[in-house]
Amino acid sequence: MAAVISNSSGTELYVDPTKAIPDLCINDVVLSTPPCYAEETLVQPSAEINTSNSSEKPIVPEISSSDVMVHSAVENLPTSDMKLWTAQRDSAVKLRLEDSDVASLPPVTIHQLFQETVNKYGDYVALASKQGDQWHKMSYKQYYEQCRIAAKGFIKLGLERYHGVGILGFNSAEWFIADVGAIFAGGFAVGIYTTNSAEACHYVAQNCEANIIVVENQKQLQKILQVQDQLPHLKAIIQYKDELKEKRPNLYTWKEFMQLGKDIPDSQLDQIISSQKPNQCCTLIYTSGTTGQPKGVMLSHDNITWTAAAAGKTVRLREATDLQEIVVSYLPLSHIAAQMIDIWLTMKYGGATYFAQPDALKGSLAITLREVRPTAFMGVPRVWEKMQEKMKAVGAKSSTIKRKMATWAKGVGLETNLKKMNGSTPHPMKYHVANKLVFKKVRKALGLDRCTKCYTGAAPITKDTLEFFLSLNIPVYELYGMSESSGPHTISLPDAFRITSCGKVISGCKTKIHQPDSDGSGEILFWGRHVFMGYLNMEDKTHESLDEEGWLHSGDIGKHDENGFLYITGRIKELIITAGGENIPPVPTEDAVKEQVPIISNAMLIGDKKKFLSMLLTLKCNVNADTGEPEDELTPEAIQFCRQIGSKATLVSDIVGGKDTAVYAAIQEGVNSVNEKSTSNAQKVQKWLILEKDFSITGGELGPTMKLKRPVVAKMYKDQIDSFYQDAGTPTENFTPPK
């Protein structure tokens, strides 16, 4: 099946799928178009290879005369040897432009995007921070000037081109200004999770060769001070909240930092800004792979600016001149989802970002939502689950009449919205009654009465939670993407969504199901200008994620239904994604527990879609030589371990069920030791259980090569796993296992 592609002059190129597709040039930028193979399913918004709607005019941002022209932003770049990917910090890549619709938007840098925003929305509120009982607001003009001042400060401190500025703290105006200022100054903006240990912070700072690290407070500062002497590239530390506990060389308050660059002329900064190209890296997002080694996802200016434009168009964000969009920033900004929504989408469309309090996820988020009343809200599944739990608890205390009314209204709401989802638009009279009596009041109580766009992503969400909110006339739309796709790849929309589907591909991008099975399921592959440049200093890992044709392999298994909606049906990778959205590779934790506790034979980490991690454990026992079945008798090594800790056990049955307190205490001690070395609280094992029988090939838990068959184990021990999560709350750090 040959693809038909038109170049900018209108010439049609008939592409032989067995041959390489020629590069085209638009605005002096080398671009590449994706190949299409007949034996693989390529699903797009239409049957044509081009994803654009020919009846729609491309949305091309107006570039003012004060902006650097697009072609000059990419001139002087060597193009003959340029590839779609790189692992080098100072390299550029081919941009994946196409010659129609959103994919043809002129590439722009972060500075060009911001300057155009200032020209359009300069006097509109950009950022709002609560100080006491008052909201302190900053306009886009002020925001832009603060970023320039910060950039000069970074230059004064010696920030080198293509070196990192690490940012370690809760969401704030200073976080945003440091991020954008680092990019203006020619460095990389690098978010670091506040839950990271000192060692994890060291890895990120060392990997990006950070010259400067910006921390929120004394708690985060201490992490950096612990590893400062192991960071040869580090030149300065800046603390943006609270007073310094002590004076140290090259340690600055935010106020001091913002005064440092006063003698840096505008021309010096402008020269650095004008040298930046859309196809060069500006941001690093650190994620974890299956080995547990964090990878620095290199995002270019174009990755970010184009994704903001394309995603915004897809979800129909309004420009501030029509009606300003308002968001609440509370999710970790080291995560691509928060960055894209809170920083870049709002910047593109002139939206206002209000910062929540640091204890947002401990309860104050509800207060902030009621105060701010956002027009768009992104919540990871755990946030929606917490809302659901809270509302159910409140409802249980209501009067009988109110409970009956709520039950009736929810039934009406779910029925009406499910019909709407399937194409029915008329709303029955009972829906309007339910809306007035229940739905509007619920939305107001949640602070979502102005919110027309409620999203969830970063982790899977349950059907129960989606239907709960749908019954209250609050459709929660799923997003799907990854750090390597600059955030969203598919999005659900009010007129195009299905329960448990993550929607359809955003404008200008493509999805391919690789090697689909008889059910249509296969690995999900991405194509578009949102696809990342590569992993910093990790060429092999880059080639694992990006194939020779440039398709991004997600590691997820999925399929499309007959209407083009994408469903995730499984995971190729073994990464666990908790309900809080944190990616956790299970093998390192499992191996660490087995190393700490020699009596452990097999360990399987549980936590996908869950609030916390738990673990299934088996003990080392003898195996029947004839059948291969595990027996009850412990191995000599296991018995020796028992003797060392004061246990007299010789059988597995002597221990399981809490019968042997010495063994249980030793295992808990080992788990605690592993938890102490974890990089965040989300990576700590909170509950565990010893199974009565070891895993085996004959039992079905292990494959022919003794590889753990996780889905099989999860199904076999579903009841035990469910028992871990029956309580609503999250257990304490040193949870005592059940007896």
Swiss-Prot record:
It comes from the Eukaryota. It is found in: Cytoplasm. Its main location: cytoplasm. ATP binds at residues 287-295, 478-483, 556, 571, 684. GO terms for molecular function: arachidonate-CoA ligase activity; ATP binding; long-chain fatty acid-CoA ligase activity. It is an enzyme of class 6 (ligase). Its EC number is 6.2.1.3, 6.2.1.15. GO terms for cellular component: endoplasmic reticulum; membrane. It catalyses: a long-chain fatty acid + ATP + CoA = a long-chain fatty acyl-CoA + AMP + diphosphate; (5Z,8Z,11Z,14Z)-eicosatetraenoate + ATP + CoA = (5Z,8Z,11Z,14Z)-eicosatetraenoyl-CoA + AMP + diphosphate; hexadecanoate + ATP + CoA = hexadecanoyl-CoA + AMP + diphosphate; (9Z)-octadecenoate + ATP + CoA = (9Z)-octadecenoyl-CoA + AMP + diphosphate. Keywords: ATP-binding, Cytoplasm, Fatty acid metabolism, Ligase, Lipid metabolism, Nucleotide-binding. Pfam families: AMP-binding (PF00501), AMP-binding_C_3 (PF23562). Belongs to the ATP-dependent AMP-binding enzyme family. Bubblegum subfamily. Catalyzes the conversion of fatty acids such as long chain and very long-chain fatty acids to their active form acyl-CoAs for both synthesis of cellular lipids, and degradation via beta-oxidation. Can activate diverse saturated, monosaturated and polyunsaturated fatty acids. This is Long-chain-fatty-acid--CoA ligase ACSBG2. It comes from Xenopus laevis.
